[in-house]
Amino acid sequence: MSSTYARFDTVFLLSRFAGAKYSPLWPSSSSSSHSSLLSSGIHLRAKPNSRLRSVTGASSSSSGPIIAGSESIEIKSLPTKPIEGQKTGTSGLRKKVKVFMQDNYLANWIQALFNSLPLEDYKDATLVLGGDGRYFNKEASQIIIKIAAGNGVGKILVGQEGILSTPAVSAVIRKRKANGGFIMSASHNPGGPEYDWGIKFNYSSGQPAPESITDKIYGNTLSISEIKVAEIPDIDLSHVGVTKYGNFSVEVIDPISDYLELMEDVFDFDLIRGLLSRSDFGFMFDAMHAVTGAYAKPIFVDNLEAKPDSISNGVPLEDFGHGHPDPNLTYAKDLVDVMYRDDGPDFGAASDGDGDRNMVLGNKFFVTPSDSVAIIAANAQEAIPYFRAGPKGLARSMPTSGALDRVAEKLKLPFFEVPTGWKFFGNLMDAGKLSICGEESFGTGSDHIREKDGIWAVLAWLSILAHRIKDKKPGEKLVSVADVVNEYWATYGRNFFSRYDYEECESEGANKMIEYLRDIVAKSKAGENYGNYVLQFADDFSYKDPVDGSVASKQGVRFVFTDGSRIIYRLSGNGSAGATVRIYIEQFEPDVSKHDVDAQIAIKPLIDLALSVSKLKEFTGREKPTVIT
């Protein structure tokens, strides 16, 4: 195999010799390997070096102890060829884990990424690496580190054991002024040998790479011919510290500290601590055996004095405990069952695989994500120190209900309706136009980072409750989640909202359904009757970014009626198999006397209309949704 070599000089690390130990995080070449980078003649391991040194003991340096170092590293060029199926979106690349474990599949994508970036974005630069702890993350970490070194990256900051939530990656990038970061996650999709894995890249602002880069990545996967790899040993990710090879270093960092520090800056922890330490206030957080399990105890228990047993499923597992780490009423059923008991907690929440989504519940009360972001925005200035000067602007994704619109109108704030995808919020934040935003898909966040943030949303709700309860004496009735929501509805009106998900539909039928709906839209006219509803307009949503002028088209088929009701159809490709058809149904109700009606009853006529208009059963063969939110 042909190879090229590069040498980097370094100052020899003088230290007490203690021997350097490395624990391979993937099988040896004699075992079933994850990549041809392992099974070919190159095993991504440095040659024996007599000058390998180790420093033991704690260090007061923020970068931790130096674990090992070497005078030089070899960079090898490994021949490769394009692999089909690496089309990349703003959520990165998601496939079944077995696909990523195929020869060079991940390595090709990582090299294609470096081939897509300007040299100054990574040469001698610092990049962050972390993920949600799912199966294959540790092995993938080693591949990414070696290819990063091979391409001239100066430093990798990696979470201990490869753990960093998606919000934490964004926070670390911003705090440490890194040039970007890799996030190893398939978000809320299941994990394990038979399930999903994913990878995406975030820019120096902490937000996902724009389409201009993801399109280049895909283009480069179609023409790639070599992978640049540094021959260094696997990095021990189990201990905080710095490992150096030539001019390249890997710093294993505490995955909690930077994120916790940011949360302490955003929120009044003393105020929240006063709430969670009350004997008459019940709290429960379900980490779903996902990445927020690593954050829940340090934040909620150790810092905010919640009871230790208030954290459920708090140990991150590679397969999420055989669960589906999607915080909704279907997949977080254990939490829902507890919250709907007569003696259930006052407040409950759950987060997803990589920690960027959230679900909020009161006792026997579910808060829709659309209402949640609106209520946070309406209360932010008085309850959250970060917003003392007031939010700069508000925004929601197009399918999200119009609840937030009414808050923006009352508070006289700039408002934006954007396509689904957090990058659209990030552009507005970077331009100073936006503070609080959300998506109906259980994503809520603010400009403290450039990703949605599950724990942030939970702390925001706890802040709102704590602000209302702080003067309540033991024995006095506490303000409940339901009280906060009902007060909001009385002020702004209620947007009845539901989403029907039909997961893993045959892609051909799902796409034909959307094309059929686009044909209806093209022929539609205002004033047409759809049952008892009168059409105001129908379109396929398009968005022109007010910051960079870019246009996103075909973002969802909308039917908007004169009474404010909406039906929206979208396809989601974030799963690793088939397509997910999503139908969103919304109806605004200003009459307080009608706010207690069950949402599914209130919008049933619209649901029936949505199914009839789309001919969903005819196109997909599906009679019932997989998930109703």
Swiss-Prot record:
One of its GO terms (molecular function) is phosphoglucomutase activity. Its cofactor is Mg(2+). CDD domains: PGM1. PROSITE patterns: PGM_PMM. Alpha-D-glucose 1,6-bisphosphate binds at residues 94, 187, 356-357, 420, 439, 441, 452. The keyword Chloroplast applies. Inhibited by the Calvin cycle intermediates fructose-1,6-bisphosphate and ribulose-1,5-bisphosphate. The modification Phosphoserine is found at residue 187. GO terms for biological process: glucose metabolic process. It comes from the Eukaryota. GO terms for cellular component: chloroplast. Residues 1-69 form a transit peptide. It catalyses: alpha-D-glucose 1-phosphate = alpha-D-glucose 6-phosphate; O-phospho-L-seryl-[protein] + alpha-D-glucose 1-phosphate = alpha-D-glucose 1,6-bisphosphate + L-seryl-[protein]; alpha-D-glucose 1,6-bisphosphate + L-seryl-[protein] = O-phospho-L-seryl-[protein] + alpha-D-glucose 6-phosphate. Gene3D superfamilies: Alpha-D-Glucose-1,6-Bisphosphate, subunit A, domain 3, Alpha-D-phosphohexomutase, C-terminal domain. It holds the Pfam family PGM_PMM_III. Binds 1 Mg(2+) ion per subunit. Belongs to the phosphohexose mutase family. This is Phosphoglucomutase, chloroplastic.
